[in-house]
C-alpha cells in the first residue's frame, strides 16, 4: 500500500482524474448547501486504497493506518486475521462491550478479505453474539444473512477462522454443540438445497464433522419460508425456518473451501483445525475425472444439465464439430471472457454476439463472448454440397441462407490465465501457426514474409516440410484424429482408384486440384469423411474438387499419380498414420474440443426499479397503477374530498430553528429538520430518548398522514420554472428508507422532462455486460487520434507517436467505453443534471453537452450489484456492441470478472449530487448496490486476485505448447508466462501489456442476440431446435428432451399448482385477496377483482411440449409425463358433462 508505483505518465493520469473529481465535489457541495437534500455535502467518501475503503465501509476509526502497516509486512489473509485480533483486543478502536468489539473485529477482517468492496461485511453479517455452552463457558455466535453470498466462498470460510482467531485472543471458549443441534444443521442444509441452490452440497457426515468441530457457532437469520420438520423449537436456535446465510457459509464456505482454510491454519500454526484433513480427504474421493486420470480429460456435461428454452446448445461435451480450443489472448478477451470469430456469430443464427454469456464445459463455468477475427471461423456444408470455411463476416452474411450443416463451429480463444485461475489441467493445444513458427525459426533462416508464412501456398508448405523437416503447416493439417482406421483406408483406396490429380499450368509444385466423382463419393460414404477431416472442397460438374490437394494426397500415402507409395502402417492413431505415410511431421489439428451452450444474452439497458420511478416521493394509491404524480395532484378520495389530498406514510419532522413541522429534509427557513419522534403505542412525544418512558417501545417519526399534495406539486413546478404539461411523472407507492422522508419533488419533474429513471438511492444508472479491453484504436471508439491525444494517449504499443486513427494503444486502467445506446441515455442524464444545477440549485451547469461527443472525457462511477464501493472511471469513447468495455483492472476493482456479469455506470456529478444513504431501504441488503465509498485510484495489488492471472505476452513460449501435450497443471509453467502477478509493485503493472491475437474490430458481429430479437418463447424454442439440427456437434433430440425436462415441464407443473393456490387482485388499487370478495368488487376501492394466474398461463407450453415430444421422439417417460399433465389441465378447465348447444339443436329437439 502507500504511494502508487507507476510511471510519471500514469501518475499524471491519476492526478488528473483526482483533480477533476475534487473540482466536481466542490461544485456538488456548493449546490447541496442550497438544496433540499438530506445533507448539505456530498455523501460518498473517497478512498485511495483498500485501507480507506475498509474504514469508510465499517466505520472503525484508525483502522486504515493499521491495515497499511500490517499489509506492508504480511499477506492479505494474515493481515485480515491480525487486524481482527487487534480490533477485538481494543488496540484499534474503542467499544462499549466485548461483544461489540468482537463484532467489529469480524466485520473489519471480512472487509479486508473482500477488498473493502462488497457489502457482505455490513449486510452479510447481521450480528455477532456471545452464547453459553452447557458447562457455563461462553462461545461466539456469528449470525450470517443472505448477502454473505456476495463475499465468495473463501471469504465466508475465513470469516469463521477470524472468529476463532479473535476468540483465542480475548479468551472466549469454543462452541460445544448439542447432538440435536448437529442434526438440525444436517436437516436444514439439505432442505436449503431443495428450496434455494448451493454450489456445493456436503454429505450428511461432512456436515456433522464441521458442526461438531468448528470452534465458532455458525448461526443466521431465517431467510426462507420453509421450516424444518424435525429438530424444531431448539433452545439455542431461535427459529424453525431455514437460515440461508448459515447454509451458505457452512456448505459453500467451510466445506467447499476447506483446502484454502487449511493452508491459512498451517501458516498461522493454529491448533483445533485438524478435522479439516478428514474433510479434505472426503472431498478428494469425489474429485473430477481430470484429477483421477491425469493423462485423459473426459467430457463434462454439467453445463447442459439445466437447459432453458430459446438458448441453444452449440456443442455437446467435447464432441467433434464443437469449439476447437485455441490458446491465446486478444485485446478484448481474458479474465473469463473468450473469443470466437464474428463470422461464427452470424452463422450460428445471431444467437451469440459480443457480451453473450456461454456456459462452457471448461476451464470455468461460463464466459462472455468477444469477436476475434484472427482465429478460424466455422466450416459449413452448403446446400450445393460445397464445404467451405467462413472466416470473414461479410462472406458469412452472404452464405448464411445457403448453409445446410455446420460441420465445425470454429475455434474458441481462451487464455492461459483462465486455466490458471480455475486450476484446470492444460488441455493439449492444437498445432497452430503460433507453435509452427517456433519450429520453423529453429531450423530455417530463410527470410519469408510473415503473411506468406501465415497463409502459405501448398508448394511453400511442402518445400519447408521436405527441405527443413519443419512439421506440415497447420493450414494443410487435417483432422485425422476424427476418423477411424476403416474410414482412412476407405478414403485412401477411393482416392487412389477413382481420383484424378489435375496439375495447374504454370503453378508451383502442389498447387494442383484433386477431382473425385461426386455420386460414388456420396454412395461409398467418402464425402462425409472429407467433411470430418475439414478438407475444403467444391461440388460442380458431377465432381468434388479439392484445391491445393497435394499435401492431402501425400498424407494418404499416395504419390502425384495417386499410386500407393507406402503401405498402410499398423497403428490405430490416424495422425501418426498420416505422418508415416507422408514422411512429414504431422500434429493434431484439434485435440481439444469445448462444449458450450448459451447462457444470458448481452445487456445494455437503462436501470429501472420495478416498477420504474423518477422520484422517491410516496403517493400510495393516488397515482393509480402507474404511480403517476400528475394523477395524484388531481386525486379525490370521494365526492366531497379535497382535490390532491392523499393519505401516505411519511416521517414527521420539525425545524429546530422555527419549530415548523414538515415532511422534508429542509425547512422553508433554510434550516435542516430533525425527526419528530413519538411512541407508536402511547402517542406521546419522545425526544432525546431511545425508548418510550411509559411502555419502553422504540419511538418512530413515521405515521400515516393526510398530505395536501396539490400545492406541493404546483410549487415544485414553479421552483424549477417548468409548466405543468407533463403526462406522467413516476413516483413510488411507499418509501423504504428508515425515516420515510422523500426526495425533493423538483428532481422528479426534471427527470421526467428528460425521460430518465432512478434507482433506490436517487441515482440514474445504465447497465451493461462486462467485457475486458486492454488495447484500443481511435477508429473503433467513434473518435479521432487527435481526441485521444487530448486524453493523454501519446504513443502506440510499439512506442511510436500516436498520429493515425488505426494505431493500437494501451488502454488506461480507469478508462471505459459505453454502447451508443448507453451514451444517448447518459447524454439525457447530463442534460438533466445541468438543468438541476441551474434551475433547482441555482449554480452554473457542469456538462454543457449537446451531443454524445461532448461526453468524451467525462468522469463516471462504476458499480457492481453486490458491492458497496464505486470506482472512478473516465469515458473515452463508444461502441456499437451492447456491452461496457473497460480495463480488466476496472472490472476487478468492482470484484467482477467477465464471465457474463453485468454492472452499471452513472455520471459522476449525478452520483455525488443525488446519492444519499438516507434514501437506502431499511432492510437486509439495502446497502448493497450503493456507492457507500468511491475508489479514486486503482491499485492492481488490491483488485480481485483473478486479474493477477491475466497473461500479457505477445506470443506464448514454445515450452507452453509442449506443456499442454503433457496435460500439466498450469501452475507448473507459471514462471515462464508474463502474468500481471509478476509485475505487481512495478511501474509495468499498468503499462506495456501485449496480446497474442488481434482483432480488426472489437464490435464486429450481430448488434443484438437473436434471443432478444425473436418474439415469443415458442419462436425462440423453434429457432433453438432449428440451429441444433444444423450443427454436427449437437444432438437435437437430446436438446429437445432436456428442454422439456428442465424448463417446460417444471413450468407447466408450477403454473398448475399456482393456479389452484392463487390470490385475487384489484386492477384499480392493487389490493390482493386470498378469496374473491362476495360482492365481486374490491371492498377498498370498488374496482374489479381479477385472477392473478390465468388459464392461458397454465396451458402456455402444453401444445408445444406435445409437438416437440412427437417430432423429436423423446423418451416414453417424458411423453407420459406430458400426457398426464394434459389430462390434469383438461380436467381442471374443461367440464365434459356440459355440452354447448346451438339454437338449431334446441329447435330440432335434440336438446331434450
Swiss-Prot record:
Subunit description: Heterodimer of a large subunit and a small subunit.
InterPro entries: PolC_DP2, PolC_DP2_cat_dom, PolC_DP2_central_dom, PolC_DP2_N
Zinc is among the record's keywords: no
Protein's name in the database: DNA polymerase II large subunit
Lineage of source species: Archaea, Methanobacteriati, Methanobacteriota, Stenosarchaea group, Methanomicrobia
Keywords of the record: DNA replication, DNA-binding, DNA-directed DNA polymerase, Exonuclease, Hydrolase, Multifunctional enzyme, Nuclease, Nucleotidyltransferase, Transferase
Family: Belongs to the archaeal DNA polymerase II family.
An annotated Gene Ontology molecular function: single-stranded DNA 3'-5' DNA exonuclease activity
Amino acid at each position: 500500500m502507500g504511494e502508487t508505483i507507476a510511471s510519471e505518465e500514469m501518475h499524471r493520469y491519476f492526478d488528473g482524474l483526482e483533480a477533476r473529481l475534487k473540482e466536481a465535489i466542490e461544485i456538488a457541495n456548493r449546490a447541496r448547501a442550497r438544496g433540499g437534500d438530506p445533507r448539505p455535502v456530498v455523501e460518498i467518501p473517497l478512498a485511495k486504497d483498500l485501507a480507506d475503503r475498509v474504514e469508510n465501509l465499517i466505520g472503525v476509526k484508525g483502522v486504515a493506518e493499521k491495515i497499511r502497516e500490517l499489509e506492508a509486512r504480511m499477506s492479505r489473509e494474515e493481515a485480515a486475521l491480525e487486524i481482527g485480533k487487534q480490533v477485538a483486543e481494543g488496540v484499534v478502536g474503542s467499544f462499549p462491550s466485548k461483544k461489540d468489539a468482537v463484532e467489529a473485529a469480524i466485520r473489519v477482517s471480512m472487509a479486508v478479505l473482500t477488498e473493502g468492496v462488497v457489502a457482505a461485511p455490513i449486510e452479510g453479517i447481521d450480528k455477532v453474539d456471545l452464547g453459553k455452552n452447557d458447562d457455563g463457558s461462553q462461545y461466539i455466535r456469528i449470525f450470517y444473512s443472505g448477502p454473505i453470498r456476495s463475499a465468495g466462498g473463501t471469504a465466508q470460510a475465513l470469516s469463521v477462522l477470524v472468529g476463532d482467531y479473535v476468540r483465542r485472543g480475548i479468551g472466549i471458549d469454543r462452541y460445544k454443540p448439542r447432538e440435536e443441534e448437529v442434526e438440525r444443521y444436517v436437516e436444514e442444509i439439505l432442505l436449503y438445497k431443495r428450496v434455494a441452490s448451493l454450489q456445493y452440497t456436503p454429505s450428511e457426515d461432512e456436515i456433522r464433522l464441521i458442526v461438531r468441530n468448528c470452534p465458532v457457532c455458525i448461526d443466521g437469520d431465517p431467510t426462507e419460508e420453509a421450516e424444518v420438520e424435525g429438530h424444531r423449537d431448539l433452545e439455542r436456535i431461535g427459529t424453525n425456518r431455514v437460515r440461508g446465510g448459515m447454509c451458505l457459509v457452512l456448505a459453500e464456505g467451510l466445506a467447499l473451501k476447506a483446502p484454502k482454510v487449511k493452508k491459512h491454519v498451517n501458516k498461522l500454526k493454529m491448533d483445533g483445525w485438524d478435522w479439516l484433513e478428514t474433510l479434505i480427504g472426503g472431498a478428494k474421493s469425489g474429485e473430477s475425472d481430470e484429477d483421477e486420470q491425469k493423462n485423459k480429460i473426459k467430457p463434462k456435461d454439467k453445463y447442459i444439465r439445466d437447459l432453458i428454452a430459446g438458448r441453444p446448445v452449440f456443442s455437446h461435451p467435447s464432441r467433434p464439430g464443437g469449439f476447437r480450443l485455441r490458446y491465446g489472448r486478444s485485446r478484448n478477451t481474458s479474465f473469463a471472457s473468450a473469443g470466437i470469430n464474428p463470422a461464427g456469430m452470424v452463422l450460428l443464427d445471431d444467437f451469440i454476439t459480443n457480451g453473450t454469456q456461454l456456459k462452457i464445459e471448461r476451464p470455468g463455468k461460463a464466459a462472455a463472448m468477444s469477436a476475434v477475427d484472427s482465429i478460424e471461423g466455422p466450416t459449413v456444408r452448403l446446400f450445393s454440397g460445397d464445404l467451405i470455411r467462413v472466416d470473414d463476416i461479410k462472406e458469412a452474411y452472404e452464405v448464411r441462407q445457403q448453409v445446410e450443416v455446420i460441420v465445425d463451429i470454429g475455434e474458441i480463444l481462451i487464455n492461459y490465465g483462465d486455466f490458471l485461475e480455475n486450476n484446470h489441467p492444460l488441455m493439449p493445444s492444437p498445432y497452430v501457426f503460433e507453435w509452427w513458427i517456433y519450429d520453423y525459426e529453429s531450423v530455417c533462416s530463410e527470410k519469408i514474409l510473415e503473411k506468406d508464412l501465415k497463409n502459405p501456398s501448398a508448394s511453400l508448405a511442402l518445400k519447408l516440410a521436405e527441405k527443413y523437416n519443419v512439421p506440415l503447416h497447420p493450414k494443410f493439417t487435417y483432422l485425422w484424429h476424427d476418423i477411424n482406421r476403416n474410414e482412412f483406408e476407405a478414403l485412401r483406396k477411393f482416392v487412389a482408384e477413382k481420383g484424378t490429380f489435375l496439375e495447374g499450368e504454370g503453378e508451383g509444385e502442389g498447387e494442383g486440384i484433386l477431382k473425385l466423382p461426386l455420386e460414388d463419393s456420396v454412395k461409398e460414404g467418402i464425402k462425409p469423411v472429407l467433411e470430418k477431416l475439414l478438407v475444403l472442397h467444391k461440388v460442380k460438374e458431377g465432381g468434388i474438387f479439392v484445391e491445393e490437394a497435394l499435401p492431402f494426397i501425400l498424407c494418404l500415402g499416395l504419390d502425384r499419380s495417386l499410386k500407393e507409395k507406402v503401405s498402410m502402417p499398423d497403428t490405430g492413431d490416424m495422425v501418426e498414420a498420416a505422418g508415416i505415410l507422408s514422411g512429414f511431421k504431422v500434429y493434431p489439428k484439434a485435440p481439444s474440443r469445448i462444449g458450450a451452450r448459451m447462457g444470458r444474452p448481452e445487456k445494455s439497458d437503462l436501470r429501472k426499479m420495478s416498477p420504474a420511478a423518477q422520484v422517491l416521493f410516496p403517493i400510495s394509491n393516488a397515482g393509480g397503477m402507474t404511480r403517476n404524480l400528475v394523477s395524484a395532484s388531481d386525486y379525490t378520495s370521494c365526492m366531497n374530498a379535497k382535490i390532491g389530498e392523499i393519505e401516505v406514510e411519511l416521517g414527521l419532522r420539525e425545524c429546530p430553528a422555527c419549530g415548523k413541522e414538515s415532511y422534508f429534509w429542509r425547512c422553508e427557513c433554510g434550516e435542516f429538520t430533525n425527526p419528530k419522534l413519538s411512541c407508536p403505542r402511547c402517542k406521546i412525544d419522545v425526544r432525546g430518548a431511545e425508548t418510550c418512558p411509559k411502555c419502553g417501545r422504540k419511538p418512530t417519526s413515521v405515521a400515516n398522514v393526510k398530505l395536501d399534495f396539490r400545492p406541493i406539486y404546483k410549487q415544485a413546478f414553479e421552483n424549477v420554472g417548468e409548466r405543468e404539461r407533463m403526462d406522467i411523472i413516476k413516483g413510488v407507492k411507499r418509501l423504504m428508507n428508515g425515516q420515510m422522508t422523500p426526495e425533493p419533488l423538483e428532481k422528479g419533474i426534471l427527470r421526467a422532462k428528460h425521460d430518465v429513471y432512478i434507482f433506490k438511492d436517487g441515482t440514474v444508472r445504465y447497465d451493461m455486460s462486462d467485457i475486458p479491453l486492454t488495447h484500443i484504436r481511435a477508429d473503433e471508439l467513434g473518435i479521432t487520434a487527435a481526441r485521444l491525444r487530448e486524453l493523454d494517449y501519446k504513443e502506440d504499443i510499439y512506442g511510436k507517436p500516436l498520429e493515425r486513427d488505426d494505431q493500437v494503444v494501451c488502454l488506461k486502467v480507469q478508462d471505459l467505453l459505453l454502447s451508443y445506446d448507453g451514451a444517448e441515455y447518459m447524454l439525457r442524464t447530463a442534460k438533466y443534471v445541468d438543468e438541476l444545477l441551474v434551475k433547482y440549485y441555482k449554480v452554473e451547469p457542469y456538462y454543457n453537452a449537446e451531443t454524445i461527443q461532448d461526453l468524451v472525457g467525462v468522469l463516471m462511477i462504476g458499480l457492481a450489484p453486490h458491492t458497496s464501493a464505486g470506482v472512478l472511471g473516465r469515458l473515452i469513447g463508444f461502441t456499437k456492441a451492447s456491452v461496457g468495455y473497460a480495463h480488466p483492472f476496472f472490472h476487478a476493482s468492482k470484484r467482477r470478472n467477465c464471465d457474463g456479469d453485468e454492472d452499471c455506470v452513472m455520471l459522476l456529478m449525478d452520483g455525488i449530487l443525488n446519492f444519499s444513504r438516507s434514501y437506502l431501504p431499511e432492510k437486509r441488503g439495502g446497502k448493497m448496490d450503493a456507492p457507500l465509498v468511491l475508489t479514486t485510484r486503482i491499485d492492481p495489488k488490491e483488485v480481485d486476485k483473478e486479474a493477477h492471472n491475466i497473461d500479457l505476452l505477445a506470443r506464448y513460449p514454445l515450452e507452453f505448447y509442449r506443456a499442454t501435450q503433457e496435460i500439466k497443471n498450469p501452475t507448473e509453467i507459471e514462471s515462464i508466462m508474463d502474468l500481471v502477478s509478476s509485475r505487481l509493485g512495478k511501474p509495468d503493472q499498468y503499462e506495456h501489456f501485449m496480446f497474442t491475437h488481434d482483432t480488426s474490430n472489437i464490435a464486429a458481429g450481430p448488434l443484438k442476440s437473436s434471443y432478444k430479437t425473436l418474439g415469443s418463447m415458442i419462436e425462440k424454442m423453434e429457432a433453438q431446435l432449428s440451429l441444433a439440427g444444423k450443427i454436427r456437434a449437437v444432438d437435437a433430440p437430446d436438446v429437445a428432451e432436456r428442454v422439456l425436462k428442465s424448463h417446460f415441464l417444471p413450468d407447466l407443473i408450477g403454473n398448475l399448482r399456482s393456479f389452484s393456490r392463487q390470490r385475487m387482485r384489484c386492477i384499480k388499487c392493487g389490493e390482493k385477496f386470498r378469496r374473491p370478495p362476495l360482492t365481486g368488487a374490491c371492498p377498498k376501492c370498488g374496482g374489479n377483482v381479477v385472477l392473478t394466474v390465468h388459464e392461458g398461463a397454465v396451458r402456455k407450453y402444453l401444445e408445444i411440449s406435445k409437438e416437440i415430444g412427437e417430432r423429436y421422439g423423446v423418451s416414453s417417460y417424458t411423453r407420459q409425463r406430458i400426457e398426464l399433465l394434459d389430462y390434469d389441465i383438461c380436467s381442471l378447465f374443461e367440464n365434459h358433462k356440459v355440452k354447448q348447444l346451438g339454437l338449431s339443436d334446441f329447435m330440432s329437439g335434440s336438446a331434450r
